């Protein structure tokens, strides 16, 4: 009988040979020398961490995609002998057999590694888009309270990552996640007459409804903004707002309205993230774009929440935020209720309960799109203190029955500790480009080296949990 362990008893990380597992709580063993420890995750879930956490292209490498996985000892221990266990069903929980006379294993006494069988070396580069020079700091902006508990922020944006524009402003009020609705206007200013901007002359009022514009042919316009922007009489508006000395032909504007989550497109549009820096007493506003460039000024109006049931939940964290470095936690997902998904259709489901092991100080967590031969699972809306909402797509030809006993087979991981330093080991995975960014400085992380030699095809993927040997 396998010794059951829960999801919080193990820690997983990226090592030089593959995915590293170690016990983070004491493991009390029954009488006897041989023990079969059952890990709470499957090989599929563990590889999802590598694929969507740090190694964005792991399964796209043919050698890895066709290799037979093996769970083996990562660090020898004289008191514990580990017998390797091959994983023949990637959706079945992994297990390892050990031999020891100890009745209790202290934290980190048991260290395992999920590797590819063989001795050949395969270097898999982590997807990253490095930028020259030091990381950019958020531009300084200003904020003013508006009527009805609203907050107005304006100022010049600066690139804080290849895909985000940032603005920092002092604010001593309630936490910024208390706002749910937003109204964002970005103005592209070019030429020599940009010495005086919104933050200086306080003359960037939020335009009236319908007065928004888009310059689809304007160079440097964010792709997300083009899809969301509406055309309107921007010329007259720019002339009346006193936007510095910017000539009408040099000013281009984009406008977004609505909630943080765009259900039609399945991701943030344009992508609004706010976080507080306790050390400086300021709030950072990050707007996600496809390509971050200098020369944008913003005018933002934030309205208090919470949202109505019709509006749904606001995604308070950047969907690209994956985890803090070297702090991983796995979490299997089960639907909250029974449901039937028709062939080639999708439904929205909610995971059971809230995050386990989470505390109010935790800022972010994520899981990315994953698929097997029966379904495709992807996130919809999640916050650090609410149930997890998912979309399940039936890619088969028969109705798909799922329920609380169905493990959808995806790892969820989040920071083990919070840091008020916005640059402390954050890892950004850009959904649209599939690129990985390490911190605001976008430094290039090392490559992951996996041993690959014997290549055997994987069995047919199935969400069931069959017997292993």
UniProtKB/Swiss-Prot annotation:
Specify where the region named Disordered lies, as residue ranges: 203-245
Give the protein's recorded name.
Uncharacterized LF1 protein
Any other noteworthy remark?
LF1 is absent in strain B95-8.
Q: Which domain of life is it from?
A: Viruses
Q: Which organism is it from?
A: Epstein-Barr virus (strain GD1)
InterPro entries tied to this protein: Herpes_Orf11
The UniProt family comment states:
Belongs to the epstein-barr virus LF1 family.
């Amino acid at each position: 009988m396998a010794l059951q362990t829960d999801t919080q008893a193990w820690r997983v990380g990226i090592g030089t040979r593959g995915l590293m597992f170690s016990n983070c709580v004491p493991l009390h063993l029954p009488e006897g020398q041989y023990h079969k420890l059952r890990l709470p995750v499957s090989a599929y879930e563990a590889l999802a961490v590598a694929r969507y956490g740090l190694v964005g292209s792991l399964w796209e490498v043919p050698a890895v995609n066709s290799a037979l996985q093996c769970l083996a000892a990562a660090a020898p221990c004289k008191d514990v002998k580990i017998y390797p266990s091959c994983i023949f069903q990637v959706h079945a929980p992994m297990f390892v057999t050990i031999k020891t006379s100890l009745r209790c294993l202290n934290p980190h006494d048991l260290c395992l590694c999920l590797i590819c069988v063989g001795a050949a070396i395969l270097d898999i580069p982590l997807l990253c888009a490095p930028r020259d020079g030091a990381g950019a700091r958020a531009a300084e902006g200003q904020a003013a309270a508006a009527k009805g508990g609203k907050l107005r922020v304006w100022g010049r944006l600066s690139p804080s990552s290849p895909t985000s524009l940032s603005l920092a402003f002092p604010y001593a009020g309630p936490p910024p996640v208390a706002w749910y609705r937003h109204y964002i206007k970005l103005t592209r200013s070019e030429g020599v007459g940009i010495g005086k901007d919104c933050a200086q002359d306080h003359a960037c009022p939020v335009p009236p409804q319908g007065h928004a514009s888009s310059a689809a042919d304007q160079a440097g316009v964010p792709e997300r903004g083009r899809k969301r922007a509406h055309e309107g009489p921007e010329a007259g508006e720019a002339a009346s707002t006193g936007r510095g000395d910017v000539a009408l032909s040099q000013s281009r504007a984009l406008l977004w309205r609505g909630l943080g989550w765009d259900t039609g497109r399945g991701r943030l549009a344009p992508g609004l993230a706010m976080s507080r820096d306790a050390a400086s007493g300021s709030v950072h506003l990050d707007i996600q774009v496809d390509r971050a460039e200098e020369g944008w000024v913003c005018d933002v109006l934030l309205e208090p929440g919470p949202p109505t049931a019709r509006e749904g939940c606001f995604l308070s964290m950047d969907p690209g935020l994956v985890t803090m470095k070297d702090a991983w936690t796995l979490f299997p997902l089960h639907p909250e209720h029974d449901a039937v998904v028709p062939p080639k259709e999708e439904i929205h489901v909610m995971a059971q309960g809230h995050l386990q092991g989470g505390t109010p100080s935790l800022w972010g967590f994520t899981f990315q799109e994953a698929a097997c031969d029966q379904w495709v699972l992807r996130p919809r809306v999640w916050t650090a203190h609410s149930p997890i909402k998912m979309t399940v797509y039936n890619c088969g030809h028969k109705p798909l029955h799922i329920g609380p006993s169905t493990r959808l087979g995806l790892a969820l991981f989040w920071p083990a500790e919070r840091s008020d330093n916005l640059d402390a080991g954050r890892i950004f995975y850009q959904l649209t480009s599939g690129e990985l960014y390490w911190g605001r400085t976008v430094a290039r992380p090392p490559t992951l080296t996996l041993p690959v030699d014997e290549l055997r095809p994987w069995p047919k993927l199935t969400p069931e949990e069959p017997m292993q040997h």
